[in-house]
Design a protein with these regions (language model features):
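N-terminal Rossmann NAD(P)H-binding glycine-rich loop of SDR-like oxidoreductase domains
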Residues: 5-25
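Rossmann-fold scaffold of SDR-type NAD(P)-dependent oxidoreductases
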Residues: 8, 72-78, 118, 227
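Conserved glycine-rich Rossmann-like NAD(P)H-binding loop of the short-chain dehydrogenase/reductase
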Residues: 27-38
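NAD(P)H-binding glycine-rich loop region in Rossmannoid oxidoreductase-like domains
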Residues: 53-97, 128
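Conserved Rossmann-fold NAD(P)-dependent oxidoreductase catalytic core, especially the SDR/UDP-sugar
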Residues: 77, 102-136, 161
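Glycine-rich NAD(P)-binding loop of the Rossmann-fold in SDR/ketoreductase-type enzymes
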Residues: 89, 93-101, 131, 135, ...
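NAD(P)-dependent short-chain dehydrogenase/reductase
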Residues: 136-138, 142, 146-201, 206-210, ...
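C-terminal substrate-binding subdomain of Rossmann-fold SDR/epimerase-dehydratase oxidoreductases
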Residues: 190, 194-290
């Protein structure tokens, strides 16, 4: 029997790639979307697939009414709002998207689902093994995991998976992240500003992340909190220097400091048998040599 999967946050980079991957499998996707997304070209294209069903809503009571009509086996929560700003307007949106919305969906479907897959951030553990949020966004991500713990108490039938991410990258990435910024600024012949020449980051290709999701869906994976990371951190200055040796036109870069940034994030369990075989340098060369 086809697994019935509900996904939130599908308009984002991670969510859209998970949908793309899962629609190739023997599953039916229910996609929770605000009504304003109804006429988007991407959604119209997805609706041509018989295994894709959008669920449009404006108010939570509408969403509750629609979700109670369908059978769902698994929730994949990709809904997220990210900003570094902690002003009143952004705090409200951070809490609304990253805590309240996700909690409402879980409350509505708690008696139906078998698995709940959630994405967190290693920004929650920026200074060591204890909770040390880098920003308010990290606070909201951590807070929703505490909401999950509340639901675990009376819903032993649900397996919860919390996947903590550093950085993801891949095709068609429009986010204001370092990898798409390198590509965009190079093609526009603009300088790239890097916060420190000693910046080190951990990157996972989106295809490797979707493989993790498929493993959780189709295999017996122990529930829990996992870090999805590459085996090695990459020094950005070293990466750019290596690229520049292979490019006719060099990447223009300005390092804003030499501040040493330590990646001492919480030592979480690595996801079983995870291996990101993608090569970031090869990916970048392919993109900027188009």
């Amino acid at each position: 029997m086809d697994k019935k999967i509900l996904i939130t946050g599908s308009t984002g980079f991670v969510g859209s790639n998970i949908i793309r991957s899962l629609l190739k499998k023997n599953v039916h996707i229910y996609d929770v979307l605000r009504s304003k997304n109804k006429n988007k070209i991407k959604i119209k294209k997805l609706r041509r697939n018989k295994n894709y069903s959008p669920i449009f809503y404006n108010k939570f009571y509408e969403l509750q009414k629609k979700l109670k009509r369908i059978k769902i086996d698994i929730i994949i929560n990709c809904a997220t709002f990210y900003t570094k700003k902690n002003d009143i307007k952004n705090i409200e949106k951070l809490v609304q998207t990253n805590i309240i919305f996700c909690s409402v969906v879980l409350e509505i479907l708690k008696n139906k689902i078998k698995k709940f897959i959630n994405f967190g951030s290693m920004m929650e553990y920026s200074k060591g093994n204890r909770f040390s949020p880098e920003n308010f966004y990290a606070v909201t991500k951590y807070s929703f995991q505490k909401v999950e713990e509340f639901y675990k108490l009376d819903n032993k039938n649900i397996k919860f998976y919390d996947l903590k991410l550093y950085e993801t990258y891949g095709d068609n990435d429009q986010r204001k992240k370092i990898i798409p910024t390198i590509i965009k600024n190079y093609l526009l012949n603009k300088n790239i500003k890097i916060v420190s020449r000693n910046l080190e980051m951990n990157f996972v290709h989106i295809d490797s992340l979707t493989n993790v999701i498929e493993m959780i869906i189709f295999r017996k994976i122990k529930e829990g909190e996992y870090c999805i990371k590459n085996k090695k951190f990459i020094k950005i200055q070293k990466l750019i220097n290596s690229l520049n040796k292979k490019l006719l036109k060099k990447i223009k870069v300005k390092y804003l400091s030499s501040y040493k940034i330590i990646n001492s994030g919480k030592k979480l369990k690595n996801f079983p048998n995870f291996n990101d075989k993608k090569n970031l340098e090869e990916f970048l060369l392919k993109k900027i040599n188009k």
